[in-house]
């Protein structure tokens, strides 16, 4: 902290303020109280006084030698052409001599010059002193002339003011005279008028003329008086303006004179300081505290005058040798020319906290002298406001990138995340939510960034085609509960036998068919009704125009029926209800209608908008009415789509065929899909190599609302992905690769974020059993359904862990993964190849095959039940009453007992009850009857018993005998 007054400086020196005031008075510094301010010059004068009073001499000179060493390497080829590395070490040595001021520095610089040079130096200094005196005299003469000029201007100003005052007085006198003359004239006129009236009282016409004349004269006199007053006012305003202008000129002249005085004072002190030896009375003197060598920063005049004084001291070496390589050969203490000419050395030695860049710094770096040259102004740093940045956070970002966006160190981000309970590294990828929380925690504003993704080109690059909107067939999704006859109804419509081909008689795949009727084409989507296929049904409702809700007349509304209604309402799709199985004796269509009304589906006959059609998939009753109602709804919707345009659609189902590769069933929603088109479906892309209809027959094109199966994609696309035709395969590849990377980054970030949470959960829950599974299915929809169904089986004690799930056959990679993770492989409608089977047998990997989802779920549930810890139950087998107590040496207390209930076995556990309160629980140590060891004693018999580690048995106690049995638990 810099000392600003006497009291603070005394506290810094750890001495009484009164003693310091006495020393300041002795040094010639006039300070009256402890609150008086102290300048650096005052402190310097006090220091000089104390040095002189203690007998310090100016001849005590010390010097400092700095040695710099720089090592570098160069590579040079020898005669054989082989490169060699040579170490080059450059050493530089400089000597600094302590100086009190510029004059003494010049004398020290000339210490090695001969005595004859001293006389020349003295003459040169006298000449410079004479020139400085002449310059000062000239400046003083100029100042006197300017002061005389200012005095003349002041006299002129006063003269002008007096003249203006005299003019103002004259104007006032003239105005008063005019007013008096006007009053006299008016009095004469009044008297004349009265005389005229007295003389000519009878002449009325003549007096009227006289009155008019008098009124005109009075008006003229008033006008003249008004003009005189205006002239006087203008003269006064002009006088005031002149006075204001004179005052401004005087102030400007005084300010100029003050500036001249300050200008004259500043260089005079600096030049005297540069020529004459330092005097205690001169304030601008170098501050020397505690024997340091530094000098305070000088004003511009001093810095301009200093080279003129320094130059002769080092002129000889600076002028005789050129700058450059010759300067490097000079000795460190030989002169100042080499130090000043070298641009790298001119910057000086940097010290910590010095922001001057080495300019005009007279101190070295080092632990003892560090920071002493700073004045009080440089030590204070104003507080700055925290900078709040707007940070754009992408979907995934590493810790280092996030820190760079906030302009802070990565270690700060890591510290904040450690406080939040998450251990991260500098290269770890964070998801968007976590990164935004960290940004908010650090006081910045987080904004979800919009990525420069190539998908934006899809929207920007869409050319508006003028293709004509033509009517298209309706897309009808058949939905309902399992076993309500959806597929059988479609079979009757298609005249096919699809249901017989499904395993277990239930639909486990989403199917797409189009049917040609006399009134038009209808495209049907058949969705599974099992509860596991929720995602499939949601995809079917998303791509549909009309929903046919199939409800069995004998079963009514079931859970999946309600779910189908919810999907249809969420998509805003009209519903046509088909009440199936009306040919059964127990069919009750009216009950079905009432249940559907309760769910919000009101029939048309009740005033609603949903047609109800009773049908029988077995006999074909009502099929035509159903198709009629579907086409009627389609006409109301007025479904249209462009045909002559690039195709767009949706992936209904996807699978991996061993011979064909990735195969996708897509529904074209607009445009026409041709064989050879480049398609993009999610992260998969490719050229359509083959296109088949639902019957497996090749086709060249597919229009709106037509389902087709395409081949040629790079990978199996996700079910529900949008399919779009692009003109360029390069653009399709770019977008697909971008989507793959984004999906991978997001998945990795979420996995890393969940690692610590799951670890802490497992630590808190104790030992949790894991059932690792690898699932391979024939199509993606079945794989999704099976994964979701199995994950729902997880409990607090046994957890289902899906290590890997994919579409396709079971390969060696799957078996190797199962070996590493100790997982069970489940194949749903898929099989393992020969190599995978052989590898699984050698590694003991269990592979299970299923074709019905019920069986897979039930067997996994049974396996999880076997992993549950068995439940321990206590079974009370008998009660014993203590009749007598015996003390047996080396054995302890033996109780003579009567078995009052049940049976007592040797291996049982026992509780000791006293007054129906349990006082001990342990095991039987011995069980005897008539001195013979027995295994059991039944009710009504006496026996002798001893309890292990318990001898405090009294008569009247009861022993409760029990056994612990383990019971297997089930889910």
UniProtKB/Swiss-Prot annotation:
Q: What GO MF terms are annotated?
A: GTP binding; GTPase activity; translation initiation factor activity
The places in or outside the cell where this protein is found are: Cytoplasm
Organism, as annotated: Burkholderia ambifaria (strain ATCC BAA-244 / DSM 16087 / CCUG 44356 / LMG 19182 / AMMD)
What the entry lists under InterPro entries is as follows:
DNA-bd_dom_put_sf (IPR009061), EF-G-like_DII (IPR053905), IF2_assoc_dom_bac (IPR013575), IF2_II (IPR044145), IF2_N (IPR006847), P-loop_NTPase (IPR027417), Small_GTP-bd (IPR005225), T_Tr_GTP-bd_dom (IPR000795)
The residues covered by the tr-type G domain are 471-640
Spell out the Pfam families in the cross-references.
EF-G_D2, GTP_EFTU, IF-2, IF2_assoc, IF2_N
Give me the residues that bind GTP, please. Answer: 480-487, 526-530, 580-583
Sorted UniProt keywords: Cytoplasm, GTP-binding, Initiation factor, Nucleotide-binding, Protein biosynthesis
List the record's Gene Ontology CC terms alphabetically.
Answer: cytosol
Q: Which CDD domains match?
A: IF2_eIF5B, IF2_mtIF2_II, mtIF2_IVc
- State the residue spans of region: G5: 616-618
Which residues lie within the region annotated G1?
480-487
PANTHER family for this protein:
TR-TYPE G DOMAIN-CONTAINING PROTEIN, TRANSLATION INITIATION FACTOR IF-2-RELATED
Q: Which residues lie in Gly residues bias regions?
A: 355-368
Which residue stretches belong to region G3? 526-529
Region called Disordered, residue ranges: 49-86, 101-385
Family, per the entry? Belongs to the TRAFAC class translation factor GTPase superfamily. Classic translation factor GTPase family. IF-2 subfamily.
Record flagged with keyword Cytoplasm: yes
What name has this protein been given in UniProt? Translation initiation factor IF-2
- The answer, when asked if Secreted is one of the entry's keywords, is no
Task performed by this protein: One of the essential components for the initiation of protein synthesis. Protects formylmethionyl-tRNA from spontaneous hydrolysis and promotes its binding to the 30S ribosomal subunits. Also involved in the hydrolysis of GTP during the formation of the 70S ribosomal complex.
Residue spans of biased composition, Pro residues class: 277-286
Q: Return the annotated region ranges for G2.
A: 505-509
């Amino acid at each position: 902290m810099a000392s600003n007054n006497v009291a603070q400086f005394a506290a810094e020196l750890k001495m009484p303020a009164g003693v310091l005031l006495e020393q300041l008075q002795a040094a010639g510094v006039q300070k009256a109280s402890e609150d008086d301010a102290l300048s650096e010059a005052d402190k310097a004068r006090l220091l000089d006084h104390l040095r002189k009073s203690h007998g310090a001499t100016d001849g005590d000179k010390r010097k400092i030698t700095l040695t710099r060493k720089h090592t570098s390497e160069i590579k040079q080829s020898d005669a054989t052409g082989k490169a060699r590395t040579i170490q080059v070490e450059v050493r530089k040595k400089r000597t600094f001599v302590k100086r009190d001021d510029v004059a003494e520095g010049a004398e020290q610089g000339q210490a090695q010059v001969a005595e004859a040079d001293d006389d020349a130096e003295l003459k040169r200094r006298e000449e410079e002193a004479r020139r400085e005196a002449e310059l000062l005299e000239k400046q003083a003469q100029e100042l006197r002339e300017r002061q005389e000029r200012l005095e003349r201007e002041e006299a002129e100003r006063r003269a002008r003011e007096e003249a203006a005052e005299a003019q103002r007085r004259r104007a006032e006198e003239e105005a008063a005279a005019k007013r008096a003359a006007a009053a006299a004239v008016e009095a004469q006129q009044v008297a004349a008028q009265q005389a005229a009236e007295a003389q000519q009282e009878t002449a009325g016409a003549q007096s009227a003329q006289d009155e008019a004349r008098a009124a005109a004269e009075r008006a003229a006199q008033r006008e003249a008086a008004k003009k005189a007053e205006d002239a006087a006012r203008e003269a006064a305003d002009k006088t005031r303006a002149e006075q204001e202008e004179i005052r401004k000129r005087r102030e400007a002249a005084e300010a100029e004179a003050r500036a001249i005085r300050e200008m004259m004072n500043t260089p005079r002190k600096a030049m005297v300081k540069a020529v004459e030896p330092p005097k205690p009375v001169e304030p601008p003197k170098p501050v020397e505290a505690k024997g340091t060598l530094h000098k305070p920063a000088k004003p511009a005049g001093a810095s301009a005058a200093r080279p003129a004084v320094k130059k002769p001291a080092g002129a000889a070496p600076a002028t005789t040798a050129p700058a450059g390589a010759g300067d490097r050969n000079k000795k460190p203490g030989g002169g100042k020319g080499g130090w000043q000419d070298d641009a790298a050395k001119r910057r000086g030695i940097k010290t910590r906290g010095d922001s001057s860049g080495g300019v005009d710094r007279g101190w070295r770096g080092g632990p003892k002298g560090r920071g002493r040259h700073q004045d009080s102004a440089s030590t204070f740093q104003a507080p700055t406001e925290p900078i709040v940045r707007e940070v754009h956070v992408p979907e995934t970002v590493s810790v280092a990138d996030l820190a760079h966006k906030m302009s802070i160190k990565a270690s700060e981000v890591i510290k904040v995340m450690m406080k939040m309970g998450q251990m991260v590294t500098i290269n770890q990828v964070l998801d968007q939510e976590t990164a935004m929380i960290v940004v908010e925690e650090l006081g910045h504003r987080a904004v979800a960034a919009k990525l420069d993704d190539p998908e934006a080109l899809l929207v920007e690059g869409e050319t508006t085609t003028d293709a004509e909107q033509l009517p298209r067939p309706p897309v009808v999704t058949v939905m309902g509960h399992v076993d309500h006859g959806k597929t059988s109804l479609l079979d009757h419509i298609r005249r096919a036998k699809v249901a017989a081909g499904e395993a277990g008689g239930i639909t486990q795949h989403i199917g797409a068919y189009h049917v040609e009727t006399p009134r038009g084409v209808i495209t049907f989507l058949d969705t599974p009704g099992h509860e596991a296929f929720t995602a499939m049904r949601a995809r079917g409702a998303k791509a549909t125009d009309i929903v046919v809700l199939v409800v069995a007349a004998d079963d009514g509304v079931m859970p999946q029926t309600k779910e189908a209604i919810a999907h249809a309402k969420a998509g805003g799709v009209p519903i046509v209800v088909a009440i199936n199985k009306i040919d059964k004796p127990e069919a009750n269509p009216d009950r079905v209608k009432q249940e559907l009304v309760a769910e919000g589906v009101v029939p048309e006959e009740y005033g609603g908008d949903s047609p109800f059609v009773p049908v029988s998939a077995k006999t074909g009753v009502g099929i035509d009415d159903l198709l009629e109602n579907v086409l009627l709804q389609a006409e109301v919707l007025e479904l249209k789509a462009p045909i002559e345009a690039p195709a767009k659609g949706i992936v209904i189902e996807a699978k991996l065929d061993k011979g064909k590769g990735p195969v996708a069933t897509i529904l074209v929603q607009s445009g026409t899909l041709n064989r050879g088109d480049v398609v993009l479906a999610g992260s998969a892309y490719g050229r359509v190599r083959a296109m088949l209809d639902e019957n497996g027959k090749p086709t060249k094109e597919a229009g709106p609302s037509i389902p087709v199966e395409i081949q040629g994609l790079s990978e199996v696309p996700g079910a529900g992905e949008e399919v779009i035709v692009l003109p360029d395969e390069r653009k399709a590849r770019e977008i697909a690769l971008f989507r793959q990377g984004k999906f991978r980054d997001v998945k990795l970030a979420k996995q890393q974020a969940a690692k610590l949470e799951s670890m802490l959960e497992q630590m808190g829950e104790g030992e949790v059993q894991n059932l690792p599974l690898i699932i391979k299915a024939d199509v993606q929809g079945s794989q999704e359904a099976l994964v979701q169904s199995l994950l729902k089986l997880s409990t607090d004690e046994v957890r289902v862990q899906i290590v890997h799930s994919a579409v396709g056959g079971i390969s060696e990679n799957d078996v190797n993964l199962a070996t590493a993770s100790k997982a069970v492989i489940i194949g749903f409608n898929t099989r393992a190849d020969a190599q995978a089977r052989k590898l699984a047998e050698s590694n003991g990997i269990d592979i299970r095959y299923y074709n019905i989802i019920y069986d897979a779920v039930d067997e996994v549930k049974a396996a999880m039940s076997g992993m549950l810890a068995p439940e321990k139950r206590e079974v009370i087998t008998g009660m014993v009453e203590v009749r007598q107590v015996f003390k047996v040496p080396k054995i302890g207390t033996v109780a003579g007992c009567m078995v009052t209930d049940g049976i007592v076995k040797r291996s049982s556990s026992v509780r000791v009850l006293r007054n129906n309160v349990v006082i001990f629980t342990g095991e039987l140590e011995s069980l005897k009857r008539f001195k013979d060891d027995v295994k059991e004693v039944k009710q009504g018999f006496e026996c002798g018993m001893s309890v292990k580690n318990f001898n405090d048995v009294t008569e009247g106690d009861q022993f409760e005998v029990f056994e612990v049995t383990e019971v297997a638990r089930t889910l």
